[in-house]
Design a protein with these regions (language model features):
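Hydrophobic alpha-helical segments, chiefly the membrane-spanning helices
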Residues: 1-325
Length: 325
């Protein structure tokens, strides 16, 4: 494949992945409304689960590109923290008051599995399983420990809604359910094929211009699939519900470092030596960026233009390291 055509395919696939993920999320959202799914579950499904990043990393792992799979997770997480958090904070103050402390303190657990994998890649199966179980534990704790008042309120509203729903409305809802299911299926199929072509075009570009695959995964793919996160946080801030966008970003970080990373380790073949660029950026992420975010959220309990400066500075350091090493 000529490099010009490979670049076109790469760009088209990114666009398809972006919109296909919207199809999936729209479908799940409508299903949640029809089935009266609790808000906390909807938040994880609609916002926290990062389908395009997951599919891209898993496809990379299956296609013999383990460094892109892992680099994509690290790069996406660094950009989510240093850019998706910091950019809106330049214009609006973001409060962490409604984010429970233990959620922020759980982030280093996921970072630990990444660092251990980078040091001992031969134990990838062990660290992959630990990352997956860490995410499952995170979800279970959230469901079990949710606010009893909110749970009671939801149950009461659900009972009232059931009493008010007529037989005609029930039939209408049964017909309506096919639309979100169709959206979901179309989105999943489009995501699968677009991700396959994305990885193939990536491989062709790497071969043509001799770009290190770790650098490519860390910056280009990771940056290109974060557009919806920027818009989500901006909109939630303008609607005076910043905890929705903030919770979505945190959920995405935990999903990618738990499920996306963990399953990628299980799918990939034995990797060669870890590239220096990925190792350095992994240390930067776990040893510097995560502690900075945790300190800001727990000590200052808000993110504004002043506290966003350290994160933006770390983003610049990350980009420089990615190209230098």
């Amino acid at each position: 494949m000529q490099i010009g055509w490979a670049i076109v395919v790469f760009i088209v696939c990114l666009v398809v992945i972006f919109f296909a993920a919207d199809f999936v999320l729209d479908g799940i959202e409508e299903l949640g409304e029809i089935w009266k799914v609790p808000t906390i579950i909807l938040a994880y499904i609609l916002i926290g689960i990062d389908l395009e990043e997951t599919v891209a990393s898993w496809s990379a792992a299956l296609n013999g590109l383990p460094h892109i799979a892992v680099g994509n997770v690290i790069g996406n997480t660094i950009i989510s923290i240093c850019f998706c958090f910091a950019l809106p904070a330049i214009f609006f103050e973001i409060s962490f008051q409604k984010i429970r402390k233990w959620i922020m303190l759980s982030l280093p657990v996921f970072g630990l599995w990444i660092i251990l994998y980078l040091i001992f890649p031969q134990l990838r199966i062990v660290f992959g399983i630990l990352a997956i179980f860490s995410y499952v534990g995170f979800v279970v704790i959230n469901i079990v420990s949710k606010d009893p008042l909110k749970a009671t309120e939801f149950e009461e509203n659900e009972e009232e809604g059931e009493n008010k729903v007529s037989e005609a409305e029930r039939k209408y809802l049964k017909k309506k359910i096919w639309k979100p299911i169709l959206l979901f299926v179309i989105g999943i199929v489009a995501l699968y094929f677009a991700s396959e072509w994305l990885i193939n075009s990536t491989h062709d570009i790497l071969n043509a211009v001799n770009i290190d695959e770790g650098v490519f995964g860390l910056i280009i793919i990771a940056a290109g699939t974060n557009v919806e996160e920027y818009m989500l946080l901006f909109k939630s801030i303008k609607r005076k519900t910043p905890e929705i966008g903030l919770g979505g970003l945190i959920g995405k970080i935990i999903w990618n470092n738990g499920i996306t990373f963990g399953v990628s380790l299980l799918l990939m073949s034995a990797p060669s030596a870890i590239p220096l660029s990925i190792l350095i950026n992994g240390i930067l992420f776990v040893g510097v960026i995560l502690p900075t975010l945790i300190i800001i959220s727990l000590n200052y309990k808000k993110l504004n233009w002043k506290s966003s400066i350290p994160l933006l500075t770390l983003l610049c350091v990350y980009i420089v390291f990615s190209f230098v090493f």
